[in-house]
């Protein structure tokens, strides 16, 4: 998923390194040629598959353990979507069985957040948890608990699209946002008044009102709070030549902090203040490109611009009559560039082969 913000967030020194391969329709034989790191205190297993709803397509899921801060009262939640397009842990209230402490504003009122994504919004209180993933731990982390019925959604939040606060809508029990930013908003949400993007609310009994939220109290990228291995992530998946029901990979914490997370000669594309870089396709530059494991496909251009027909029943997917082998060029804010090759096959055919709906 990608949080639909155009605000001045605080850019942290995080690196996202995604290593994987994919192809079009054809043989289901997995011809993996890259070696996946599977062991280490900083390695968390992930599965790309159908998720807890059984009908998600191309979702990278993992498990996360949350605890009441400074206690052994903990719960491990499966089916959490790994999302490099956002920052912060967000859990459905329906998946959470332990009671976490509520974050409060200076006047004692509960703090609640409305976070817009391209596909809709999440609404729910900010609570505090210790987070454990693989051998890593972050203490007293502000997280969002989505769809808590104690706090009715204000109109300004509901106007941002459809709610993603149910299992059927989200397709996951939560989101693990490990993107480029230390917080989910940054400096713009600290101040009150004009310029505040209206993400954070304090909610007295009379109703919720927009409030400023300090950087430390905002929903945090948990990776930034690990004691070590806290400067980025590697999302590592095997190469595949055709549709698969599921594949296994690893989420590796840290860049260059252990023997298993070096850059290994990878090209580094730095991003701008919004987390974007430039992708050029057919010599046309698109300067709002981003890496988003929370989206379940490669999203680029419109059918009229790409020349590829869309699916008759799902206009947001392409359905060419034969597999299209294409390429584009990525360029970072640092000027580094490189070509990426990819294939576009009929989404109808691919989904039919693995028994999925258009999700």
For the regions a language model picked out, list residue spans one by one.
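Aspartyl protease catalytic core from the pepsin/retropepsin fold
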Residues: 60-71, 76, 120-182, 323-358
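Bacterial signal peptide processing site
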Residues: 23-26
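Bacterial N-terminal signal peptides that target proteins for export
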Residues: 1-11
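C-terminal motif of bacterial Sec signal peptides marking the signal peptidase cleavage site
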Residues: 18-21
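C-terminal catalytic lobe of pepsin-like aspartyl proteases
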Residues: 96-134, 224-227, 231-358
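Aspartyl protease catalytic domain
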Residues: 30-57, 140-286
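Short hydrophobic beta-strand that contains or immediately precedes a catalytic carboxylate
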Residues: 79-83, 89-91, 175, 288-292
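Primarily extracytoplasmic ectodomains and periplasmic/lumenal surface modules that are beta-strand-rich
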Residues: 71-73, 78, 85-89, 97-99, ...
């Amino acid at each position: 998923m990608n949080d639909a913000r155009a605000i001045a967030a605080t850019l942290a020194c995080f690196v996202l390194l995604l290593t994987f391969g994919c192809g079009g329709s054809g043989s289901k034989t997995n011809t993996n040629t890259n070696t996946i790191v599977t062991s280490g205190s900083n390695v968390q297993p992930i599965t790309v598959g159908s998720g807890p709803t059984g009908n998600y397509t191309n979702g990278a899921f993992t498990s996360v353990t949350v605890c009441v801060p400074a206690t052994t009262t903990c719960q491990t939640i499966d089916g959490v979507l790994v999302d490099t397009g956002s920052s912060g842990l967000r859990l459905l209230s329906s998946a959470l069985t332990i009671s976490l402490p509520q974050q409060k504003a200076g006047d004692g009122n509960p703090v609640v957040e409305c976070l817009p994504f391209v596909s809709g919004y999440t609404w729910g209180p900010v609570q505090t948890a210790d987070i454990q993933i693989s051998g890593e731990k972050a203490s007293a982390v502000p997280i969002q608990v989505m769809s808590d019925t104690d706090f009715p959604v204000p109109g300004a939040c509901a106007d941002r699209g459809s709610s993603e606060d149910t299992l059927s809508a989200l397709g996951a029990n939560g989101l693990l946002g490990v993107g480029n930013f230390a917080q989910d908003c940054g400096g713009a949400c600290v101040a009150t008044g004009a310029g505040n993007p209206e993400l954070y609310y304090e909610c007295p009994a009379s109703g919720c009102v927009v409030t400023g939220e300090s950087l430390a109290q905002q929903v945090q990228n948990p990776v930034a709070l690990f004691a070590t291995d806290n400067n980025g992530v590697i999302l590592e998946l095997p190469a595949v030549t055709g549709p698969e029901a599921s594949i296994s990979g690893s989420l590796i914490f840290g860049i260059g902090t252990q023997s298993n997370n070096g850059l290994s000669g990878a090209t580094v594309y730095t991003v701008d203040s919004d987390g974007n870089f430039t992708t050029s396709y057919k010599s046309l530059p698109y300067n709002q490109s981003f890496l988003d494991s929370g989206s379940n496909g490669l999203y680029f251009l419109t059918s009229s611009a790409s020349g590829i027909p869309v699916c008759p029943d799902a206009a947001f997917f392409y359905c060419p009559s034969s597999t299209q082998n294409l390429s584009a060029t990525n360029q970072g804010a640092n000027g580094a560039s490189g070509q990426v090759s990819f294939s576009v096959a009929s989404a109808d055919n691919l989904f039919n082969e693995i028994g999925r709906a258009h999700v």
